[in-house]
């Protein structure tokens, strides 16, 4: 016999992605490839893409949760760029992180200067006093 065949030897274990090993949804392999191809450093460690993918996943989940809340507040079931804008600009830390970022079709935060608001009339209070 040639020594080749199904009998003998261990069966190869099912391949497991680095994302599933790390318990992530974001692609660790793709992040690793992009780090290598991007000329950020001569060498890229094995833990770096896992950490970066985890950070990206966390930030994405945080923004999507706040945007989902904004959509629900507006009685909508689909997140649109306006909801992303409201979520980011109303959160102090995310607004600082993404301060220079422009979101297409995001609009602006509703804001009216206090001096432009109508003044409360005092005649109502004087009438009660008499």
UniProtKB/Swiss-Prot annotation:
The modification N6-(2-hydroxyisobutyryl)lysine is found at residues 6, 10, 37, 75-76, 96, 119. GO terms for molecular function: DNA binding; protein heterodimerization activity; structural constituent of chromatin. Residues 7-19 have a biased composition (Basic residues). The modification N6-succinyllysine is found at residues 10, 96. The keyword Transcription does not apply. The modification N-acetylserine is found at residue 2. The modification N6-(beta-hydroxybutyryl)lysine is found at residue 37. The keyword RNA-binding does not apply. GO terms for biological process: heterochromatin formation. Residues 1-22 are annotated as: Disordered. One of its GO terms (cellular component) is nucleus. The modification N6-lactoyllysine is found at residue 10. The modification Phosphoserine is found at residue 2. This is Histone H2A type 1. It comes from Rattus norvegicus.
